[in-house]
Amino acid sequence: MLCLSGEGTRTYIQSGEAFYINGSDADSKNGLMTDNTNYLNSTKVINRFISKLSDLQDYSKAEMHKNHEAATLQLKSYTWNFDIVPCFYTDTGFYLIPDGSGNWKKTDPRIDNEHITDINQKHNGKLLELIRLAKYWNNRKVTIRIGSYLLECMILQKYENKEASENWWIDLEFRDLLNYLSSAILSDVDDPKGIQGNLNSFCWDDRCKISDALTNAYNKAVEASNMELNDKNQKGAITKWGE
């Protein structure tokens, strides 16, 4: 999240779950307002970021995220992506971020940070490495990319309800995680903050495609772990993991 300064002058109104931020003369001159209104359009703000970031040499691509709530950046020097989410911090203690429809919605990343810290500590500080591995797999484009936050929440959902184990092998944890995710992606995923509701905005067909890819990856992971543990074929296991 990248906080924008309101300089103490911006105001907003709420209608249901949607928030509308009143724009300024500068916003109007920069074409950042929703047509025929005085409200700052979150989609246009993201596009403004994209147009500026595209000029930087360190980035290979900057584009709108599928959910229209962030700018996705691809770096030249790394294989993973970064999502940039513009936000405003309010005087009542929460943040406003794009809602995907041009308006704004309420969130609070501090709750997320506390949530992931607690669960990671429960599992002896080993969970973050597993999350990074899952995100690396997700970015290999073997299927429709799962949003980083959605993926993280599904993983936390699994490990929040799992007892900590002293016998932690990241390859076996990742194997079993793939199996869990293949089922979890088919269902709605509640926002752990209790703010955004269901985080899984994929249609049923896309959910099934992602689930099939996760199942396929799980089956390969089972083969790889069997090669290593039962057949003592470490080289073959490494090759299978690479698939």
Identify the residue ranges that each predicted region occupies:
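Short loop/turn segments at strand-loop or loop-helix junctions that form parts
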Residues: 2-7, 29-30
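Acidic, low-complexity intrinsically disordered regions
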Residues: 5-7, 50, 165
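Short, charged/polar surface micro-motifs in flexible loops or helix N-caps
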Residues: 6-9, 89-90
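Intrinsically disordered, low-complexity Ser/Thr/Pro/Gly-rich regulatory segments
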Residues: 8-11, 33
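Conserved catalytic core of two-metal-ion nucleotidyltransferases
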Residues: 15-94
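Soluble non-cytosolic domains of exported or imported proteins
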Residues: 40-44, 124-125, 149
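Extended, alpha-helix-rich binding/interface surfaces that flank or overlap catalytic cores
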Residues: 74, 79-126, 130-132, 197-211, ...
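Conserved nucleotidyltransferase catalytic core and NTase-mimicking acidic/glycine-rich helix/loop elements
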Residues: 126-231, 240
